[in-house]
Amino acid sequence: MKRKPAVAGLFYPSRRDELIEQIRMCFLDKRIGPGKLPGPVETKLQNPIGLVSPHAGYIYSGPVAAWGFLEAVKFGEPSVVVIIGPNHTGLGRPVGVWPEGEWETPLGTVPVNERAVEIVLSNSRYAEEDFMSHIREHSIEVQIPFLQFVFGEVSIVPICLMDQSPAVAEDLASALAKLVAEFPGVLIIASTDLNHYEDQRTTLRKDSYIIEAIEGMDPSLLYEYLVREDISMCGYGGVATLLNMDFENVRILKHATSGDVSGDTLEVVGYLSAILF
């Protein structure tokens, strides 16, 4: 089954040439973006890496997202890319994995890695084959044009989380460890924005707690801060999955808010790019 884009023309341009140019500008942005384009991919990814990557409209979060993809290129071309995104629509299964076929963007199609999907499904107590959770969801889709831009051809495992509980994060981390055994060069993207629709000062404070938990690679602290500080982070389950894995290092690459882009600091959304390896 081919998944058609749900948010082309909304979150990013629907025309190929315009999309390529906007992604280029995300990388070349010197104020919030990294200010340079990624170099050529010179090697194969040898060990798993994780990215925390935002998923708003490219005009707002694209320059922050560019930091993560720029860094990922330095590690090498992945054998498969797992993209874990939160379910914003309420449709589908609690943990829905798109099982087969391909996903289309204005830059072309990317195949679903059916062998990798099989490994995840057979080693998870929660993950289920599901199309419905993905049909209208944007959080996974918006990562794919960036992947196509920096790597060209990749295969993916799309996982959409309505259930973002600690139990699911631990379960998925365990299933992904099995995947790593067969696909050592896996890139795992946790698609998330941070605090939503509060003023700049409040969002910077709340986001700092999330960054602290990520830097400490502490999933329990992440969940504690979410509740204690009332943080409206949308994709915490994917981030907690990364924090439950056996990564040894983490680097915070960039944090900004929508207010840094628009100048409106009354109601902002926080964006973070980080890499785990």
UniProtKB/Swiss-Prot annotation:
Q: Which Pfam families match?
A: Memo (PF01875)
Stated family:
Belongs to the MEMO1 family.
What name appears for this protein in its UniProt entry?
Answer: MEMO1 family protein TM_0087
Tell me what organism the protein belongs to.
Thermotoga maritima (strain ATCC 43589 / DSM 3109 / JCM 10099 / NBRC 100826 / MSB8)
Taxonomic classification: Bacteria, Thermotogati, Thermotogota, Thermotogae, Thermotogales
